UniProtKB/Swiss-Prot annotation:
CDD domains: IgC1_MHC_II_alpha_HLA-DQ. Residues 205-217 are annotated as: Connecting peptide. The keyword Glycoprotein applies. The lineage of its organism: Eukaryota, Metazoa, Chordata, Craniata, Vertebrata. Residues 1-23 form the signal peptide. PANTHER family: HLA CLASS II HISTOCOMPATIBILITY ANTIGEN, DQ ALPHA 2 CHAIN, MHC CLASS II-RELATED. This is HLA class II histocompatibility antigen, DQ alpha 2 chain. Binds peptides derived from antigens that access the endocytic route of antigen presenting cells (APC) and presents them on the cell surface for recognition by the CD4 T-cells. The peptide binding cleft accommodates peptides of 10-30 residues. The peptides presented by MHC class II molecules are generated mostly by degradation of proteins that access the endocytic route, where they are processed by lysosomal proteases and other hydrolases. Residues 111-204 are annotated as: Alpha-2. InterPro entries: Ig-like_dom, Ig-like_dom_sf, Ig-like_fold, Ig/MHC_CS, Ig_C1-set, MHC/Immunoglobulin, MHC_I/II-like_Ag-recog, MHC_II_a/b_N. The gene is HLA-DQA2. Glycans are attached at N104, N144. Residues 24-110 are annotated as: Alpha-1.
Length: 255
């Protein structure tokens, strides 16, 4: 299976910025993946990205033949010629066709993706937030991610990353949904992949503290009142004892 993955991925170049300390035990502080590309016989046919510490720097749109930066401000300081990516994709296509002939078109094994949904910030009703759907262990890199609100498809405020590479040659992908948390809205991240027998729905809804019952509120108020009265009584006792001590001291002084 790993062999099949390696054949499909094509060229993968990794550059690591290594820690200056340590001789035998060298640890990478940062890892940049330059020219991560794959080509496959099913859509999307391929992808070319640059990554840094697991985050996407940019990808090359193979249809428009343009470099698309994850953070557009980076394009002011550095540039990348998309023709280099197109050449890599041509090599990947040729390599894939050759290996398919050599392997009698044996397909790679479909992995079962893992899905996690969480909010970017602590949830406060009515305050803007972002839902994050992390789809991990993707192989092959073909997946549909859809957001549902109360069972209905949502398209506004949705964005997603490219397929991001992992050391085991699988991929992960992240989908984002900007939204206003509401007590009467629930959300699902719907994932479709060849490794699943049916679409997977990962449920999310805001966690709202349950309101206290009238009995609980009464008990809390009574407890607070009792503690307050006890504090007054104890304070009064201490004041009386203090006054008596002062009076006794003065009496002894006169004697």
């Amino acid at each position: 299976m790993i062999l099949n993955k390696a054949l499909l991925l094509g060229a993968l170049a990794l550059t690591a910025v290594m820690s200056p300390c340590g001789g035998e035990d060298i640890v990478a502080d940062h890892v940049a993946s330059y020219g991560v590309n794959f080509y496959q016989s099913h859509g999307p046919s391929g992808q070319y990205t640059h990554e840094f510490d697991g985050d996407e720097e940019f990808y090359v749109d193979l249809e428009t033949k343009e470099t698309v930066w994850q953070l557009p401000m980076f394009s002011k300081f550095i540039s990348f010629d998309p023709q280099s990516a197109l050449r890599n994709m041509a090599v990947g296509k040729h390599t894939l066709e050759f290996m398919m002939r050599q392997s009698n078109s044996t397909a790679a094994t479909n992995e079962v993706p893992e899905v996690t949904v969480f909010s970017k910030f602590p949830v406060t009703l009515g305050q803007p937030n972002t839902l994050i759907c992390l789809v991990d262990n993707i192989f092959p890199p073909v997946v549909n991610i859809t957001w549902l609100s109360n069972g209905h498809s949502v398209t506004e405020g949705v964005s997603e990353t490219s397929f991001l590479s992992k050391s085991d040659h699988s991929f992960f992908k992240i989908s984002y949904l900007t939204f206003l948390p509401s007590a009467d809205e629930i959300y699902d991240c719907k994932v479709e992949h060849w490794g699943l027998d049916e679409p997977l729905l990962k449920h999310w809804e805001p966690e709202i503290p349950a309101p206290m019952s009238e009995l609980t509120e009464t008990l809390v108020c009574a407890l607070g009142l009792s503690v307050g009265l006890m504090g007054i009584v104890v304070g009064t006792v201490f004041i009386i004892q203090g006054l008596r001590s002062v009076g006794a001291s003065r009496h002894q002084g006169l004697l």
